[in-house]
């Protein structure tokens, strides 16, 4: 199983957009807002564009995006 450590913000954005159907909905400084329409409504999250995103921050990003870690790990 791939480790979630050491991912950059840019890598996270690419996975969320290219593999999980999110789209960039805005940018503010070093943060990118992503959103996705689902049958339950709109889901959004914010990803900091840092060279390495800490594991706790990544878990928070995934929680807001309503994606479990196992689903995200499939695309690493």
Model-inferred region functions:
Residues 1-76:
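Basic nucleic-acid-binding interfaces
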């Amino acid at each position: 199983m791939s480790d979630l450590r050491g991912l950059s913000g840019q890598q996270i954005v690419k996975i969320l957009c290219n593999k999980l159907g999110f789209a960039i909905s805005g940018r503010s400084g070093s943060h990118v807002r992503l959103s996705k329409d689902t049958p339950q409504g709109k889901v959004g999250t914010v990803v900091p564009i840092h060279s390495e995103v800490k594991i706790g921050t990544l878990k928070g990003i995934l929680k807001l995006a309503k994606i479990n870690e196992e689903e995200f790990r499939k695309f690493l």
